[in-house]
Amino acid sequence: CITQGFITTFAGEPGTGKTSLCNILAKALGLVTDIPQRRFVDISVERGWSSHKDFIGYYNPLSKKMERSNGEVFDAFERMDSEYDCDQSRVAPFIILLDEANLSPIEHYWAAFLRNCDLASVSNRSIPLGGTQSFKLPEHLRFLATVNFDHTTEELSPRFLDRSWIIMLEPTRVDDEIDENIENAEDMVPFGAMKDAFCIREDDVIDEAIQNKWNTIQKIFRDRALQIMPRNLKMVKNYCAVGCRCMERDTPATKFAPLDYALSQKILPTINGNGENYRMLIEDLLKECTSQNMPISAKHLERMKRIAENNMGFYQFFSR
């Protein structure tokens, strides 16, 4: 998800380890070092944000100077701007975490980044700061986000869901709590190594059985007049192609693992509606995605079905 997507979102109830997982990931990549070498920045999102200038900074036309909203974040983007023209394969990734990201509408304060989510176009990716000032966005920049869902938070818009991977974390038992106290990796993992491992290659192919099941799932959506957006189709295709190369799939429960993960993290989060059409969609998907062959997707679909029965037939991935 992180290598192939510009932003990956961790969703779940408070205390499910969303922020801890982000920190563990950054440490595993060797990014949590002392400033100024540190390449992982944690931003605590605040209510009322409406622009990226609220957490980065902006050009003040009166003083003719840059005003910093957050010194650490501003310095990070300034550093990435200077790295824009360097060899992207040799530098380590730079990860920015938006913690409690939906305390404010993400599509508002992150709007400048939404148009930069297409990683196929690495030229002219930048964010404006006012006047003639801007920061260029290098290929190795990635965002993580954590979100909760209660009366204090905002819903995730279709525009955002079209661009982000969504990883739903379930509540853990006390003895399964995540240990965040791991050592930072001695060496930073180069971004080029991540691309070599997890980006699609020319010789990557999707297993025929997985492709056939994916075709069937697409038909289920078409039969219900529900569209899967072109960007999502491409993201699922690339994920499955790489997953067929990287994942072990030697048991019935893991045979369709690449598609199981891709469906649960990219397609199911877009389901949001009520009525007979959505009821039949969930029923048809459950027939195709069983607990024996696609357990992750099946679990989410069963949850959505169960909650909808007590919620006037309203089907939504994030309903709890």
Residue ranges of each PLM-predicted region?
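C-terminal regulatory/interaction module of P-loop NTP-utilizing enzymes
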Residues: 1-320
